[in-house]
Amino acid sequence: MANTKKTTLDITGMTCAACSNRIEKKLNKLDDVNAQVNLTTEKATVEYNPDQHDVQEFINTIQHLGYGVAVETVELDITGMTCAACSSRIEKVLNKMDGVQNATVNLTTEQAKVDYYPEETDADKLVTRIQKLGYDASIKDNNKDQTSRKAEALQHKLIKLIISAVLSLPLLMLMFVHLFNMHIPALFTNPWFQFILATPVQFIIGWQFYVGAYKNLRNGGANMDVLVAVGTSAAYFYSIYEMVRWLNGSTTQPHLYFETSAVLITLILFGKYLEARAKSQTTNALGELLSLQAKEARILKDGNEVMIPLNEVHVGDTLIVKPGEKIPVDGKIIKGMTAIDESMLTGESIPVEKNVDDTVIGSTMNKNGTITMTATKVGGDTALANIIKVVEEAQSSKAPIQRLADIISGYFVPIVVGIALLTFIVWITLVTPGTFEPALVASISVLVIACPCALGLATPTSIMVGTGRAAENGILFKGGEFVERTHQIDTIVLDKTGTITNGRPVVTDYHGDNQTLQLLATAEKDSEHPLAEAIVNYAKEKQLILTETTTFKAVPGHGIEATIDHHYILVGNRKLMADNDISLPKHISDDLTHYERDGKTAMLIAVNYSLTGIIAVADTVKDHAKDAIKQLHDMGIEVAMLTGDNKNTAQAIAKQVGIDTVIADILPEEKAAQIAKLQQQGKKVAMVGDGVNDAPALVKADIGIAIGTGTEVAIEAADITILGGDLMLIPKAIYASKATIRNIRQNLFWAFGYNIAGIPIAALGLLAPWVAGAAMALSSVSVVTNALRLKKMRLEPRRKDA
C-alpha cells in the first residue's frame, strides 16, 4: 500500500481467540487493509489506504459482528462564540476529526460534549483544534465555580457597554437632528468631535468583532462578527472618506455616519449583555440543585465527633447527623430513628419516618432525631450527584427540532453578505443611480439586521429552562430528544406492582379478636413471604406481643398449620378448612368471595378447629394514582395496565384507578412484545415501570419512564425518571414536554420570521441602520426571554377539550 495510515482501536466484548480471529478475518477482507487483533491487549491495529477507507468503517464492521469499540466522553468549555454560526462551525469541524464518534456544541451553555475513540485522538487534540478555529477552549473542570466565572464575564460586558454608551450618547444626538430637525450645539456636528468619539468605539470597544471576524474568515467560516465588522466598518470608513473631502475643501457639509457605526456597536453590546444576563438565568435550576449539597459532615473517629469537608467522606465512614442538619451523603441508619424531609428529591412535603437499616439520601433534611449512619455512596455516586449529571446532560443535549436551525446557521452569514452586496448594486444602479449614500445605508441595514444568534438560541435555551423546571418538580429528562418525543405520546402503559400500587402488601381487612390475630401473627412471624410480613406488621401496630411457635408446617397450595401454646392454628383457603371439616357461615363465605373479587388475598383462620377470623391482604394503590390517570385521560391519552398478575386482581386494581384497558397474565419477557403490538397499531407509547423485568419494555417503548423508587436497571433503561414514585408527575412530565416544544416553536417562528421579514425591509431602505441594529440586538434577547417564561411554568396539564 503506497499511501497508508495506521490506527489502533480498543475492542470490548471479546472472550476467546475465536472472537479475535473472527474480527481480524473480517477486517482483512476489506480492500487494502492489513489488520491484527490482539486478544490479550484487546486492541486492533489496522493499516489502511485513507483514500478508500476511514476509521468509522472499521468501527462499524466490528460493531456489526457484535463487539464494541471503547469510547470516551469529554466535556469542553468554549468561550468566544457569538452566534449559531460559531457553534455550528465548531461542531462540524469536531465531527470531521479522526477518532471523533459524535460531537455536539451548545451555544447557550458554551460547552461541547465529544464522544471519541481514545486510541485515535484525545481531549488535548480536541481543545487544540477548537483553539485553531479562533476560540478559547478547555476541559470542563467540575470543581471550578462556573457561576463566578460567568458573573465576571457578565461584569466585563457591562463595563464595555457603559464605556461604549458614554462615547456614543453625544453621537446619538445627531440622529435626533435627522429625525426631528432639532437644534443642537455646533460642537456635536463638528467632524473632529465625531471622529474622536467614534474611533475608540470602533477599534477598542468593537475590536472583538474584528478579531472574531478575522478568525472565522481565516478558517473559511463566517459568523455574526463578520456582519457587524463589515457593516460598521462601511459606515466608519465612508465617514473618514467624507471627512478627508471636507479637509481638502471638496465639501463644506460632509455626510458623516460616525454615529451609525458607534451606536450600532453600542446597541449590539447592549443586546449581547441582556442575552448573557438572560442566559445566566437559564442555569438557575442547576445552581439550585448544587446548592442543596451539604458542605461538611460529622464523622465518628475513635469515639470522637469531628467535622470534616464533604469531599473527605469515604464509603464505610460512620457519620452522625443531628436534628436540623442535612444528611451529608447516601447511607444506611445503624442507630437511632428520625423523620427525614425528602421534598428536594420527591416533592413530598410530609417527612418520612426512618429507622435502623433504612436508607437515607444525601442532601435531604434530618428533622427531629439524632442518627448514626454508614456512608454507602459518596461524591459523584450519590443520588443528588446523579440527578445533577442527568440534568446537565439534558441541558447540553440537542433536540431533533434544532437540526433545521443548525443547517441554516451554517450558510446564513455568507447568504446575508451576498444579499447586502446585491442590495448595494441594485440601489446604486437602479434605485438611485450614481448616488452612493442610499446604497450604502441600505446595505449596512441588511448586514446589521440579520441575526443568526436568534436561530441558534431558539431551541437550546428552551430545552435548558424546560428540563431545569421539570427537574425542580422531580422529573428528569435524559436528553432534548426525549423532551421532543414525549409530547407526541398518545398511549401510556403502566406496570401494576410498584408503579400503580405501592409494591408491598398490607392488611386491608380483618374480622376477629386480638387473641386470634396474636396467634396468627406468631404463626407467620418466621415466614419470609410478603403476605406474612404484612400480617406481622399489622399485629405489631396493634401492639400485640408475639410468642414462639411449637410446630409449623406449610400446606402447599392451601395455607399453613401451626401449634402455639397448645393452640392448633389453621390459616388458609376454603380447601384447607374443608379438609379439616371446618364449615363456613354464609356471611364469612360471602366476605371471602367479595375480597377475592376485589383482587385481595383472603385467608381464613381457625383455632382448635373452630373458625375464629378472616383476614385480607393486598398491595394497595398509591395515593393520587386515580387522579393521575384521570388527568391523563383529560389530556386525551389512552392508559393501559400491563401485569403478570391474574386477570381478576388486575381488573380490580384497574377499576379502583379508572383504567379501561388491562393486559394481564403476561410473562416478564412478553412485556416488550405487548408494547410492540401497540406500536404496530400506530400508537406512540410510553411505558412506566420500576422493576428489572420492566427494562426491555422501557427500551422498546417510544418513551421509557422509570419510577425513581425502582431498580437501577429500570432507571438506566428509561428516558425519563420520576423521582419518588408519585404518579402525578407523569401527566406533569407530558405537560412539561408539550410546553417546552410549544416554546421552541414560538422561538423558531420568531427567529425565522424576524429574519425573513427584516432583511427585505432593510434592503428596501425602510430602516435606518441604527434601527436595524437595535432590532438585531433585541431579537436574540426576545428569544431568551421567551424561553425564561418556562421558569414560571405551572405543570398543570390541560384538558384536551379545554
Swiss-Prot record:
InterPro entries: ATPase_P-typ_cyto_dom_N (IPR023299), ATPase_P-typ_P_site (IPR018303), ATPase_P-typ_TM_dom_sf (IPR023298), ATPase_P-typ_transduc_dom_A_sf (IPR008250), HAD-like_sf (IPR036412), HAD_sf (IPR023214), Heavy-metal-associated_CS (IPR017969), HMA_Cu_ion-bd (IPR006122). The gene is copA. The keyword Mitochondrion does not apply. The chain crosses the membrane at residues 161-181, 192-212, 224-244, 256-276, 411-431, 438-458, 748-767, 771-790. Disulfide bonds: none annotated. Residues 5-70, 72-138 form the HMA domain. Its EC number is 7.2.2.8. GO terms for cellular component: plasma membrane. It comes from the Bacteria. It is a multi-pass membrane protein. PANTHER family: ATP7, ISOFORM B, P-TYPE CU(+) TRANSPORTER. Keywords: ATP-binding, Cell membrane, Copper, Copper transport, Ion transport, Magnesium, Membrane, Metal-binding, Nucleotide-binding, Phosphoprotein, Repeat, Translocase, Transmembrane, Transmembrane helix, Transport. Mg(2+) binds at D690, D694. It comes from Staphylococcus aureus (strain USA300 / TCH1516). It is found in: Cell membrane. It catalyses: Cu(+)(in) + ATP + H2O = Cu(+)(out) + ADP + phosphate + H(+). Cu(+) 1 binds at C16, C19. GO terms for molecular function: ATP binding; ATP hydrolysis activity; copper ion binding; P-type divalent copper transporter activity; P-type monovalent copper transporter activity. Cu(+) 2 binds at C83, C86. The active site is at D495. Involved in copper export. This is Copper-exporting P-type ATPase. Belongs to the cation transport ATPase (P-type) (TC 3.A.3) family. Type IB subfamily. GO terms for biological process: copper ion homeostasis.
